[in-house]
């Protein structure tokens, strides 16, 4: 049985991973502040003909649209065509985020998801065990719906390692370090 693989359609990156990543994988995209994690996530969504979802726990939807505009990406048009769903969510109300993501997947038949960021979300969850459970639930949701996902995590300047909480890399299927 062959594994379906998903290309990112990002020049330079696809040369590093020429076959793409396995469909339904959850990839950790991590790096220091200002390394282009949000832009990478947006590029992953806008460069694909498949519908996608961008979930933001920090930036407003207007900020996300403005960032995309600087690269010539018309997110509003994609939203109007049901090729993209932007979701701004308050991390203080985490209990129903999985339902919101599930409903968004069904509404536009999404195949790609970007969560920006697990760092912001995790700071409101607090306990590492709860963060790990939430990450596993997200991974299960993505697999169940045959989506391919990116979760963004910021590396704090004072931390050694590749993620904020030190657990994200153990719950995801692959890591991209910017």
Regions found by a protein language model. Give the residues of each.
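Residue-level preference for the first positions of well-ordered beta-strands
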Residues: 24-28, 51, 111-112, 148-150
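P-loop NTPase motor core
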Residues: 96-171, 175
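Conserved P-loop
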Residues: 26-28, 32-95
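Dynamic helix-loop-helix/coil hinge segments at AAA+ ATPase domain boundaries and subdomain interfaces
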Residues: 1-8
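Pre-Walker A adenine-sensing motif
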Residues: 8-20
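Residue-level signal for alpha-helix termini/capping positions
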Residues: 18-21, 46, 106, 143
């Amino acid at each position: 049985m062959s594994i379906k693989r998903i290309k990112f359609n990002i020049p330079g990156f696809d040369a590093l991973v020429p076959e793409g990543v396995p469909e339904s994988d959850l990839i950790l995209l991590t790096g220091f502040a200002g390394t282009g994690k949000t832009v990478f996530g947006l590029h992953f969504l806008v460069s694909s003909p498949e519908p996608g979802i961008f979930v933001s726990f920090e930036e407003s939807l207007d900020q996300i649209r403005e960032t995309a505009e600087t690269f010539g990406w018309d997110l509003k048009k994609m939203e109007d065509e049901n090729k993209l769903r932007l979701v701004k969510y308050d991390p203080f109300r985490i209990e129903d985020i999985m339902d919101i993501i599930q409903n968004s997947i069904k509404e536009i038949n999404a195949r790609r998801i970007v969560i920006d960021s697990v760092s912001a979300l995790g700071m409101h969850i607090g306990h590492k065990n709860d963060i790990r459970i939430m990450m596993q639930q997200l991974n299960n949701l993505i697999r169940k719906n045959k989506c391919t996902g990116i979760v963004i995590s910021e590396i704090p300047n004072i931390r050694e390692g590749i993620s904020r909480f030190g657990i994200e890399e153990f719950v995801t299927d692959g890591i991209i370090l910017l």
